Amino acid sequence: MGNCLYPVADDNSTKLAIKEDLLIDFPEDYYPDYNETDVEAAAPCHSCSLLNYSSLPFFILVSILGILASGTILYALLRPLFRWQLYQDRSTLVQLAVGSALFSIVVPILARGLSGALITSLCHLAHLVAYGSAFAQALLIGYHACLGPQLGAGQVPGLRLGVTVGLWGVAALLSLPVVLGSDTSQGLCTVTFSGEWETLRYIHAAACFAIFVLLPLGLLGTKGLKTVLGRAPCPWVDVLWVWFIFWWPQGMTLGLDSLVRSKAIVVSTCPAQQALDMLLDVAEALAILHCVATPLLLAWVCYQATHTSPPSLPLPTTQTSHLDTLGSKS
């Protein structure tokens, strides 16, 4: 088979060599005056994928490290000792660790180099778990930034279960386009969006752009606006926001690729198309690495929470007025 740089010669190359020997006797002025620029422009543009068959060790290594790291942080979060030491919303941190572990488990199925007779339903399930867990983690981080300390203090009883079911349900719905667009081609589990599923490509790109790009930008904008206006500290900034660094390029590149495919942006040169394909592979590799980084971020959150005092929350208006009344009486 060869590779992108050094293709292996086949029978056709021998035939071409014979034709060249036969045509060498013709005079140079026999050939018409072709424009070499037009010939190069008409040639097909071929990109060498970074995540090809040789990337299988990368997928397996990331999967093993992700499973070990996620299992370790889950064990730490579920220990009874943490129930009184951890001031953060522990259930949200546990869900983030579970999402990272689920993603780590299905990473080898998504590997380009893992060939074999994969059944289509397993491929669909792998993409559902991978993107469903990624969407859920993004929504959980946004939810934790807005309501985490309040829920940890027990000020919103009965809301935690409903929010959990709702967030994971929305994440599953957002992952349906990529699930339906995935297929087993030549024994590999890939996303093709072929045939009648072509429209789902743009829906999937829009979902990734909204969750992985617009959501963190919205959190940053809200935080900056409230800081300038001197309002409440929500959303709370913590190290979990680093998670979006791993998925933000994925949302951007998928959105750009959709614009190119829909002809909204015209890529007229082959190097530009090759650069876009390379960016897509780099963004995918960076997104895969999040399953190793997420447990480390959770470990840092736990370390900070167990070595600092619980966050101070603003008192409700009724409670503040009641305390003022007691102070005036005394």
Swiss-Prot record:
One of its GO terms (biological process) is inflammatory response. One of its GO terms (cellular component) is membrane. Keywords: Disulfide bond, Endosome, G-protein coupled receptor, Glycoprotein, Membrane, Receptor, Transducer, Transmembrane, Transmembrane helix. GO terms for molecular function: C-C chemokine binding; G protein-coupled receptor activity. Disulfide bonds join C45-C270, C123-C189. Residues 1-57, 111-123, 182-201, 260-281 are extracellular. The chain crosses the membrane at residues 58-78, 90-110, 124-147, 161-181, 202-222, 239-259, 282-302. Glycans are attached at N12, N35, N52. InterPro entries: Duffy_chemokine_rcpt. It is found in: Early endosome; Recycling endosome; Membrane. Residues 79-89, 148-160, 223-238, 303-330 are cytoplasmic. Its main location: other. It is a multi-pass membrane protein. Belongs to the G-protein coupled receptor 1 family. Atypical chemokine receptor subfamily. Atypical chemokine receptor that controls chemokine levels and localization via high-affinity chemokine binding that is uncoupled from classic ligand-driven signal transduction cascades, resulting instead in chemokine sequestration, degradation, or transcytosis. Also known as interceptor (internalizing receptor) or chemokine-scavenging receptor or chemokine decoy receptor. Has a promiscuous chemokine-binding profile, interacting with inflammatory chemokines of both the CXC and the CC subfamilies but not with homeostatic chemokines. This is Atypical chemokine receptor 1. The gene is ACKR1.
